[in-house]
């Protein structure tokens, strides 16, 4: 009886113990994050392609909301903060208004937002990609310009979402190389 109990304990412990080559889910997702990034960016681009024409047709303004200074912040020491703030800006200010522009695009804007939330979650789990504290002046400029545009700001911000994806890609490519 004693040996069968010992055998059961050993079997149980062996099943619970992780294999030596495997880390936690968070560690594994961080290990695979650079390889998964192209797929996440593709998913963002695919989701955006479903609403791009709608918002770009309604965007009648010639100026850019997402300027080169934002890309420079993404590439500089404020890259982490600029990325975190811009994701938050799109999720909390832009997307909720964009969903209300037309019932036919609501589901697609929602899907785009879910893809952006997934990216943010993965970035947060992998601290080396999003370890930040400081505020970005370029993001403040984007937010101020967006607010000044009032109802036209939503069309401007959504019509330039592809630029935002490109900036995310530039930031992540830089971080992966480092």
UniProtKB/Swiss-Prot annotation:
The keyword Secreted applies. Disulfide bonds join 30-126, 80-132. The keyword Secreted applies. It is found in: Secreted. SUPFAM superfamilies: 4-helical cytokines. GO terms for molecular function: cytokine activity. It holds the Pfam family IL10. Its main location: secreted. Glycans are attached at residue 134. GO terms for cellular component: extracellular space. InterPro entries: 4_helix_cytokine-like_core (IPR009079), IL-10 (IPR000098), IL-10/19/20/24/26 (IPR020443), IL-10_CS (IPR020423). Keywords: Cytokine, Disulfide bond, Glycoprotein, Secreted, Signal. It comes from the Eukaryota. One of its GO terms (biological process) is negative regulation of cytokine production involved in immune response. Residues 1-18 form the signal peptide. Major immune regulatory cytokine that acts on many cells of the immune system where it has profound anti-inflammatory functions, limiting excessive tissue disruption caused by inflammation. Mechanistically, IL10 binds to its heterotetrameric receptor comprising IL10RA and IL10RB leading to JAK1 and STAT2-mediated phosphorylation of STAT3. In turn, STAT3 translocates to the nucleus where it drives expression of anti-inflammatory mediators. Belongs to the IL-10 family. Homodimer. Interacts with IL10RA and IL10RB. This is Interleukin-10. It comes from Pan troglodytes (Chimpanzee).
């Amino acid at each position: 009886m004693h040996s069968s109990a010992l055998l059961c304990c050993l079997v149980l412990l062996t099943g619970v113990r992780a294999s030596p080559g495997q880390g936690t889910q968070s560690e594994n997702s961080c290990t695979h994050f650079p390889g998964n990034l192209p797929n996440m960016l593709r998913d963002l681009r695919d989701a955006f392609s479903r609403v791009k024409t709608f918002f770009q047709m309604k965007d009648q303004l010639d100026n850019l909301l997402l300027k080169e200074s934002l890309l420079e912040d993404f590439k500089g020491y404020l890259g982490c903060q600029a990325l975190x703030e811009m994701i938050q800006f799109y999720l909390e200010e832009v997307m909720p208004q964009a969903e209300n522009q037309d019932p036919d695009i609501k589901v697609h804007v929602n899907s785009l937002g879910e893809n952006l939330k997934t990216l943010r979650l993965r970035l947060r789990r992998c601290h080396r990609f999003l370890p930040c504290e400081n505020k970005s002046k370029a993001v403040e400029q984007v937010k101020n310009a967006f607010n000044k545009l009032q109802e036209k700001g939503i069309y401007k911000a959504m019509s330039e979402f592809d630029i935002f994806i490109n900036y995310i890609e530039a930031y992540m490519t830089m971080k992966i190389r480092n």
